[in-house]
Amino acid sequence: QNAYYVHIDLEGGEGDVSFTGNGSNGMYVWGVQFELGTFPTSYIPTNGATATRGNELAVIDGEDFSDFYNSVESSVLAVGTVQRPVEDQGQLNIFHIGDDNTDGHGVFREHGTKDPWYHIRNNNSTPSGGNLNPSGFGDWDAGEEARIAIAFKDGDQAISVNGGNQVTATVTSSYPTANITKMWIGSHGTGSYFEGHIKRIAYYPKLLTDNQLNTLTA
């Protein structure tokens, strides 16, 4: 059996404040929560019983996706903070634009280098030049915010991280466009869940320039 307790401090501007109940006055405590996991998340309404949090991820598909997605050229901005320590293995996807086979365009913290990566995948393989790693950023550490922007069209791909760690590449063969049907936020659809907080996702139905990518992520 595991035993837990909650310690509550009442503090004012000058330090601790004492409080003694008198049978009528009191204090209200809201949102005290125990969680399994390596880091705390947001409040889970439990209504007096144990609750299990599902994976916090979103998918945009169907007409909701096709109404805004430009299959010829696109750009995406993502801002997020990971919580998993760099010494822990695992790929953490902040977003993925693709299909049910995970083909497409994904941005994640890579499990080996711990750097932010932009990965292009087609027919379950990586085309030549399909891994863009802005290694100048270094490890994406737990608690560190990364501002990542990518731009892509056939033959022209780029990624910028925090305003200057930029990599461009040319991927002219096996470019995944025709089968892209969804956008996942916080995973690549079948796993690689992003363990952290995503502050912003923005989509642009055009190819932004390198300077524009750097400005967005600065």
Model region roles, listed by residue range:
Residues 23-30, 74, 103, 144, ...:
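Residues that flank catalytic or metal-binding motifs in active/ligand-binding sites
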Residues 10-24, 178-203:
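Extracellular glycan-interaction patches encoded by glycine-rich segments
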Residues 11-13, 97-102, 153-154, 187-190:
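Short, flexible beta-strand-to-coil junctions
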Residues 58-118, 203-214:
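Extracellular glycan-recognition modules
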Residues 1-18, 27, 31, 109-174:
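Extracellular glycan-interaction surfaces
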Residues 21-25, 65-70, 175:
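A general structural signal for short secondary-structure junctions and capping/turn motifs
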Residues 13-14, 35-41, 82-86, 124, ...:
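Acidic glycine-/aspartate-rich tracts in secreted/extracellular proteins
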Residues 35-68, 166, 199-218:
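Extended recognition patches within non-cytosolic domains
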